Amino acid sequence: MGRRPARCYRQIKNKPYPKSRFCRGVPDPKIRIYDVGMKKKGVDEFPFCVHLVSWEKENVSSEALEAARIACNKYMTKFAGKDAFHLRVRVHPFHVLRINKMLSCAGADRLQTGMRGAFGKPQGVCARVAIGQVLLSVRCKDNNSHNAQEALRRAKFKFPGRQKIIVSRKWGFTKINRADYPRLKSENRILPDGVNAKLLGCHGRLANRKPGRAFIDAVA
């Protein structure tokens, strides 16, 4: 018996049902890799960022997430180069889908019990997605911006419902506005932290102030 189509589980009707000690025997999600490309490139390398945003409240299966990741990665690798981008899948499939198996062969009426004890067995997993939630994000250089948008347009066909491609106003995957980033960096208020960056402020205890630095680490 094949896998039940994901359209049967598209609407969010019930509460979150994650894998736990009460919900055992859950099959592994099809998507295992969430970061693709040059994921170790510093925050200054890729200033441009574009998002694929869900415009519906729905369940997205792990198979759809994997198909979209492959489609986006394949296009970017071919037209931009494997060293020219960083793709990140922003949703994780934690919600378990159940199926109440019915026998459809001859003589099945003596074996199955219909809707008696209809709480099903785990069949797969999906991600619960809200309106305005980011599904995929790509950061790259400005000269590959059109390739990133086309890659997300192709990945959009792997998802149900409506999605929008939105060019971010932020610098890469950070929360800092792109217009403000060069100025803050020249003032030494940006502390690179992998693919992200910390913004140093001047609030905090004087004991945390370091010599020769006007700003205090926001974490301190």
Swiss-Prot record:
The entry sums up its family as follows: Belongs to the universal ribosomal protein uL16 family.
Q: Which GO terms describe its cellular component?
A: ribonucleoprotein complex; ribosome
The record's section on Pfam families has: Ribosomal_L16
Which cysteines are cross-linked by disulfides?
none
Q: Which residues cross the membrane?
A: none
Could you tell me one molecular function GO term of this UniProt entry?
structural constituent of ribosome
Description of how the protein assembles with itself and partners: Component of the small ribosomal subunit. Mature ribosomes consist of a small (40S) and a large (60S) subunit. The 40S subunit contains about 33 different proteins and 1 molecule of RNA (18S). The 60S subunit contains about 49 different proteins and 3 molecules of RNA (25S, 5.8S and 5S).
Protein name in the entry = Large ribosomal subunit protein uL16
Q: Does the keyword Cell membrane apply?
A: no
Listed PANTHER family? 60S RIBOSOMAL PROTEIN L10
Gene Ontology BP, a term: translation
What's in the keyword line of the UniProt record? Ribonucleoprotein, Ribosomal protein
